[in-house]
Design a protein with these regions (language model features):
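Extended, charged coiled-coil/helical-stalk scaffolds used for oligomerization and assembly
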Residues: 1-139
Length: 142
């Protein structure tokens, strides 16, 4: 496997785990000298310490412009995961009965946010409810 693909795999696995656990990614100080560099960098470091393939290609051994650890790359991978998850939900739905649930509320910084959920009957006849996402709502007044 190419070094790029191995780095990408390590980043994707790290991101998937953090998403499944509902943990934040970034730290306040991600410099190499920092003791707490954030969950993403810390978990990627742990993976590289325990997997010889990853340890050969991540961080210092990766080219400076291709470490696949920047916030932009993290967001791109997160968006790809979200698209694949939505696709899996739609396949599970199988074109059956569904409802869209929407609820808005102001977050801690007083910005309006809307949660979108999908309730549907899956292929097994079970009622499922899945969060599709949380979106910023610029104005709640018509």
């Amino acid at each position: 496997m190419s070094a790029y693909r191995t780095r990408l795999e390590a980043s994707v696995e790290t991101i998937r785990w953090l998403l499944l656990q509902g943990l934040p990614f970034r730290g306040h100080d991600e410099k190499e000298s920092s003791l707490s560099r954030g969950n993403f960098v810390s978990l990627l470091t742990l993976l590289s310490q325990h997997d010889p393939e990853y340890s050969k290609v991540v961080f210092k051994l990766a080219p400076g412009n291709c470490q696949l650890t920047s916030p932009v790359v993290q967001k791109d991978i997160i968006n790809a995961c979200a698209k694949e998850t939505t696709k899996a939900i739609l396949e599970d739905m199988n074109g059956g009965f569904f409802a869209i649930l929407a609820d808005e509320s102001a977050d801690i910084s007083d910005k309006e946010q809307m949660a979108l959920c999908l309730r549907y009957v899956n292929k097994k006849g079970e009622v499922c409810e899945r969060l599709l996402g949380v979106v910023h709502v610029p104005n709640t007044l018509l």
